[in-house]
Swiss-Prot record:
Catalytic machinery residues: 144
Entry domain remark: The TXY motif contains the threonine and tyrosine residues whose phosphorylation activates the MAP kinases.
EC number(s) recorded for this UniProt protein: 2.7.11.24
GO biological processes: stress-activated MAPK cascade
Family listed: Belongs to the protein kinase superfamily. Ser/Thr protein kinase family. MAP kinase subfamily. HOG1 sub-subfamily.
Activity regulation statement: Activated by tyrosine and threonine phosphorylation.
Entry-linked CDD domains: STKc_Sty1_Hog1
List of residues that carry Phosphotyrosine: 176
Name of this chain's protein: Mitogen-activated protein kinase HOG2
Cofactor or coenzyme needed: Mg(2+)
Native source organism of the sequence: Zygosaccharomyces rouxii
Positions of post-translational Phosphothreonine modification: 174
Residues that hold ATP according to the record: 29-37, 52
């Protein structure tokens, strides 16, 4: 049964937030480079949600492509330890809004409040690696894994978020994106050659931070970051140096004095041996020698939670055919409308709530208008005329549960404080 929804406009941190009346109790929870995130209540199901506004997604082809990539990934990647897309809509101002589950806090904020007990370090690392096993099996690299991109609720359920920078598993990459503290050395040294192992390095840095309560490699800049990595791991081996493409970087690395590695058992003297062994296998200079997410899950340190029957891989590889395309904004707009329409046609993945009839008509009309506009512009590229179709939406909801749970009142109370 279709429902009628209207858009309500409000100001949040000086930013116009334009959402349907299905969502109430809007409160800001975070601001990123590409959008604003607010908490809200989904009145249709009576549950809290997070709403991320992508501001001016069609202002440039680069931003349109990035938004399209994030939407495609959120639709494709469906796993208990990954943030789940519950709704998506376009406002009359043509901003795009992603609606996901609302988690109580993130790991960065949690680590600032208190040290974590051993069982929480184990359980959180297990869930991170469980999610990465799935992501990597889909042919995807997260590329920006860090504590602030790891969300946690009061049941200690963990979800990895922010796939806007994720990329294909391609041996030829350009640029580096991850936050410095969690950046793998091959990104700093080669820039163009890296794979899923960069996520394992980031997870290892996060693992150490959960153990010690502070970043393992808090570099002040690019040079200092590399220097403190070599303080622990020693000088990079020859097979790493041979991959350096930049002449300046090569000169810098080869000019450094030789450093011997520090045994992990010596660096982490008070940490249990199994934890030190797993950390040592994650933080390896040579990417292909790092432990994989799948192998890490069977390590003795994670034995309390490891379940080979409940650590799924992706059913299909993610389709990256669009990723190398250099398309105009209006083509990305057409593709975006198609993806949004498809999301609502399949009920957000489970079809539990059928409120899509009105949305189908409205977005289909907008899609048809965009298609007509795109066709017109391909016929008359010199005209420079643009139209801005608008639309509203109904929505669908998906419910996700995690079968594993542990509790400790002290930590749960800390997480709850972030939600009140």
């Amino acid at each position: 049964m279709a429902t009628h929804e209207e858009f309500i406009r409000t100001q949040v941190f000086g930013t116009v937030f334009e959402i349907t009346n299905r969502y109430t109790d809007l409160n800001p929870v975070g601001m990123g480079a590409f959008g604003l995130v607010c908490s809200a209540t989904d009145t249709l199901v009576g549950q809290p949600v997070a709403i991320k506004k992508i501001m001016k997604p069609f202002s440039t082809a680069v931003l349109a492509k990035r938004t399209y990539r994030e939407l495609k990934l959120l639709k494709h990647l469906r796993h208990e330890n990954l943030i789940c897309l519950q709704d998506i809509f376009l406002s009359p101002l043509e901003d795009i809004y992603f609606v996901t589950e609302l988690q109580g806090t993130d790991l960065h904020r949690l680590l600032q409040t208190r040290p974590l007990e051993k069982q929480f370090v184990q359980y959180f690392l297990y869930q991170i690696l469980r999610g990465l096993k799935y992501v990597h099996s889909a042919g995807v690299i997260h590329r920006d894994l860090k504590p602030s991109n790891i969300l946690i609720n009061e049941n200690c359920d963990l979800k990895i978020c922010d796939f806007g920078l994720a990329r294909i598993q391609d041996p030829q990459m350009t640029g580096y994106v991850s936050t410095r503290y969690y950046r793998a050395p091959e990104i700093m040294l080669t820039w163009q050659k890296y794979d899923v192992e960069v996520d394992i390095w980031s997870a290892g840095c996060i693992f150490s931070e959960m153990i010690e309560g502070k970043p393992l490699f808090p570099g002040k800049d690019h040079v200092h970051q590399f220097s403190i990595i070599t303080d622990l791991l020693g000088s990079p081996p020859r097979d790493v140096i041979n991959t350096i493409c930049s002449e300046n970087t090569l000169k810098f690395v080869t000019s450094l004095p030789h450093r011997d590695p520090v045994p992990f058992q010596e660096r982490f003297k008070t940490v249990e041996p199994d934890a030190v062994d797993l950390l040592r296998r994650m933080l390896v200079f040579v990417p292909k020698k790092r432990i994989t997410a799948a192998d890490a899950l069977v390590h003795p340190y994670l034995a309390p939670y490891h379940d080979p029957t409940d650590e799924p891989t992706a059913e299909a590889q993610f389709d990256w055919d669009f990723n190398d395309a250099d398309l105009p904004v209006d083509t990305w707009r057409v593709m975006m409308y198609s993806e949004i329409l498809d999301f609502h046609k399949i009920g957000g993945g489970d079809g539990q709530i059928d409120t899509n009839a009105a949305f189908d008509d409205q977005v289909a009309a907008a899609h048809a208008a965009a298609m007509a506009q795109h066709h017109h512009q391909t016929q008359q590229q010199s005209s420079g005329k643009h139209t801005n179709p608008t639309t509203s939406s109904s929505a669908a909801t998906i419910t996700v549960t995690v079968p594993i749970a542990i509790t400790m009142p002290s930590l749960i109370m800390v997480i709850k404080r972030f939600t009140t």
